[in-house]
A protein has these predicted regions:
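An aromatic-rich alpha-helical recognition segment common to small helix-rich domains
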Residues: 78, 140, 151, 164-178
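Extended, well-structured beta-strand/loop surface patches
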Residues: 149, 153-158, 166, 183-192
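A short, exposed loop/beta-hairpin motif centered on an aromatic-Gly-Thr core
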Residues: 66-70, 157-168
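Short, cationic Gly/His-enriched loop motifs
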Residues: 61-148, 152
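Extended, polar beta-sheet/loop recognition surfaces of beta-rich domains
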Residues: 182-219
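Short helix-coil boundary/hinge micro-motifs
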Residues: 2-50, 59-72, 76-79
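Short aromatic-glycine-(Arg/Gly/Cys) micro-motifs in beta-strand/loop hairpins
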Residues: 43-59, 140-159
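Class I S-adenosyl-L-methionine
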Residues: 48, 173-176, 180, 187-188
Length: 219
């Protein structure tokens, strides 16, 4: 007799069991299938747990998860916290839920009620690669074809800002474009108070560096 097909279903509506506790997952079996169902909060919790366990695939594969900690006391606290958060029930145009984010606020190493929020992918992509990983300033790449420095900004898509003889001039173009990006996000998501606070901090960093003619090393 052949074994049952195993299926995982994610993103189901959160609910409590008869004892009043939030349900993380439940199993449904049919004659041919073994279905592991995860509530939305349950799936997010499993992702957090996997990212925070030392020596697990996430920490080995992605350096950004090295040393990341989970300070939620347990799943019940996390699931209850989710219900009260702005954006938890919001969806993208493609139907996907907004993402749980720990990086937009100050502490990028801890999943906690103080550091996490739910944000749209549009905001998340604006801050991809906003940390120095090489000798060039943020937003700057050397274009071997022209022998110049290319300024490039990321959002929902990459956008080239031009070619410059100086890496500093290319970085200045990136700074100015990033300011406009953040200002547009502030105007678009003006009801998300936590995100507004975090975006204003990013904007302050950029505007301070521009005023002081300084390089922005991390955003």
């Amino acid at each position: 007799m052949s074994s049952k097909k195993r299926i995982s279903v994610h993103g189901l509506e959160d609910f409590k069991d008869v004892s009043g506790k939030w349900v993380k997952s439940f199993i449904v079996t049919t004659p041919i299938e073994y279905i592991q169902n995860y509530t939305r909060a349950g799936g997010l919790w499993d992702n957090i747990q996997n990212r925070c366990r030392p020596n697990r695939a996430c920490q080995e594969r992605w350096k950004t998860y090295k040393g990341v900690l989970n300070s939620f006391s347990d799943f019940q606290e996390f699931a209850g916290w989710c219900q009260s958060q702005y954006g938890y029930f919001e969806r993208e145009d493609n139907g996907r839920f907004w993402s749980l984010d720990k990086d937009l606020r100050t502490d990028k190493r801890v999943y906690s009620p103080e550091s996490c929020m739910f944000i749209p992918n549009e905001v998340n992509t604006v801050f991809i690669n906003c940390k120095k990983f090489n000798d060039l300033p943020l937003g700057v790449y050397f274009d071997s074809n022209s022998g110049k420095f290319k300024a490039q900004i990321r959002g929902t898509a990459k956008r080239n800002l031009g070619l410059f003889w100086s890496d500093v001039d290319a970085h200045k173009a990136w700074q100015q474009a990033k300011v406009v990006q953040i200002q547009n996000l502030l105007a678009k998501y003006n009801e998300h108070l936590l995100m507004q606070e975090a975006l204003h901090l990013k904007l302050d960093i950029l505007q301070r560096d521009i005023a002081q003619n300084a390089i922005t090393n991390v955003l």
